[in-house]
């Protein structure tokens, strides 16, 4: 029982086997047919001596030493138990696929328990699905672990003035002893201090001692500018694909007029060249001639034909009634009327109404 368990646990997937002398000894000097490939496979360590193929070879070769797979594949159908080897696929002389399948008591041979392939005269064992998935997952886990370790070692410093940037800095090799050479991470943490010290010391790119050019540091301004440009490419492409909207100036002007009419209740001046709007109608004021009014004393009432003295005080306006506005002199003081010191109101006098007189 222990020997059977050891045979089951034997794994030969890590090796491949070949025997060029055996191929050179056959009449074709190559694996020209599937029968020759099966006979070549029988010499390998992957061959199981308990198979039905080996049972037939042991019995028949006593009478026929040249007995091979060409004869045994006909007699294998007589077995109702055990397992056997068959050539499942062949592309002579380079590729052959060999299956090991179980033989049931009913004669079915559907269950495949092993697979091997012969590629360029070398025999390999096909891995199982479990082995493939396990190897791939272990490989992926190892790569992820190495990546996280590398990122943790080269983590950028926390700087509230700028965003976090992961930089790829080449390793610096020097003949200085350990502890004197600054690490690449320290250089990445202080990219501006080196520039500031160089500007204060007045150093130049050329070393004065040997005349060699010192390596220039990275241009971080250019780096940030390129990053900003790359970030705005998406919005620029969207803006370029969006068609421009054409607006009609007349329609926009009409919309402004409607909005002003709704806001001021019809008392605002029209923008389309018409006169001031009043409740009684729109009057077009083209030319207004204001006669010269001499300066009078404050003790006399002054009135120009059809015009009130409030024009000189600045209280007259287009399209707005000047009722309850005190009359003033040219000097700006209220006019004295014979009836008293009260300022005389002007009831319903508008500039538009005086132009016809």
Curated annotation (Swiss-Prot):
Bias-annotated ranges (Basic and acidic residues): 187-199
Protein task: Component of the Mediator complex, a coactivator involved in the regulated transcription of nearly all RNA polymerase II-dependent genes. Mediator functions as a bridge to convey information from gene-specific regulatory proteins to the basal RNA polymerase II transcription machinery. Mediator is recruited to promoters by direct interactions with regulatory proteins and serves as a scaffold for the assembly of a functional preinitiation complex with RNA polymerase II and the general transcription factors.
Protein name per the record: Mediator of RNA polymerase II transcription subunit 6
Chief location: nucleus
Organism: Cryptococcus neoformans var. neoformans serotype D (strain JEC21 / ATCC MYA-565)
Subcellular location: Nucleus
Composition bias type Polar residues, residue spans: 160-186
One Gene Ontology molecular-function label: transcription coactivator activity
Complexes and interactors: Component of the Mediator complex.
Signal peptide start and end residues: none
Annotated GO biological process: regulation of transcription by RNA polymerase II
The UniProt record lists the keyword Transcription: yes
Annotated stretches, region: Disordered: 151-219, 323-357
Pfam families assigned: Med6 (PF04934)
Family in the record: Belongs to the Mediator complex subunit 6 family.
Keyword entries, A-Z: Activator, Nucleus, Transcription, Transcription regulation
Any single GO CC term annotated in Swiss-Prot or TrEMBL for this entry: core mediator complex
Gene that encodes it: MED6
């Amino acid at each position: 029982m222990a020997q059977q368990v050891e045979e089951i646990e034997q794994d030969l997937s890590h090796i491949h086997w070949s025997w060029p002398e055996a191929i050179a000894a056959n009449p074709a000097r190559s694996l020209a047919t599937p029968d020759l490939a099966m006979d070549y496979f029988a010499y390998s360590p992957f061959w199981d001596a308990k198979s039905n193929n080996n049972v037939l070879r042991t019995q028949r070769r006593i009478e026929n030493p040249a007995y091979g797979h060409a004869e045994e594949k006909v007699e294998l159908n007589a077995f109702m138990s055990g397992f056997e080897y068959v050539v499942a696929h062949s592309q002579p002389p380079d590729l052959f696929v060999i299956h090991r399948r179980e033989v049931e008591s009913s004669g079915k041979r559907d269950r495949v328990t092993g697979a091997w392939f012969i590629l360029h005269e070398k025999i390999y064992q096909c891995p199982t699905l479990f082995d493939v998935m396990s190897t791939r997952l272990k490989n992926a886990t190892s790569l992820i672990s190495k990546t996280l370790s590398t990122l943790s070692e080269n983590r950028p410093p926390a700087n509230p003035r700028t965003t976090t940037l992961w930089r790829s800095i080449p390793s610096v090799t020097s003949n200085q002893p350990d502890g004197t050479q600054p690490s690449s991470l320290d250089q990445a943490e202080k990219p501006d201090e080196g520039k500031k010290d160089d500007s204060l010391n007045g150093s130049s790119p050329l070393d004065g001692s040997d005349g060699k050019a010192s390596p220039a540091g990275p241009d971080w301004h250019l780096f940030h500018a390129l990053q900003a440009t790359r970030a705005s490419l998406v919005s620029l492409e969207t803006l370029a694909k969006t068609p421009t909207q054409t607006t009609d100036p007349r329609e926009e002007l009409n919309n402004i007029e409607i909005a002003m009419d709704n806001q001021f209740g019809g008392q605002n001046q029209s923008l389309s060249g018409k006169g001031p709007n009043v409740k009684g109608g729109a009057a077009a004021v083209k030319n207004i001639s204001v006669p010269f009014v001499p300066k009078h004393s404050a003790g006399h009432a002054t009135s120009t034909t059809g015009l009130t003295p409030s024009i000189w005080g600045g209280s007259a306006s287009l399209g707005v009634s000047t009722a309850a506005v005190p009359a003033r002199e040219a000097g700006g003081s209220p006019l004295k009327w014979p009836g008293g010191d009260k300022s005389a109101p002007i009831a319903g006098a508008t500039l538009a109404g005086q132009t016809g007189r």
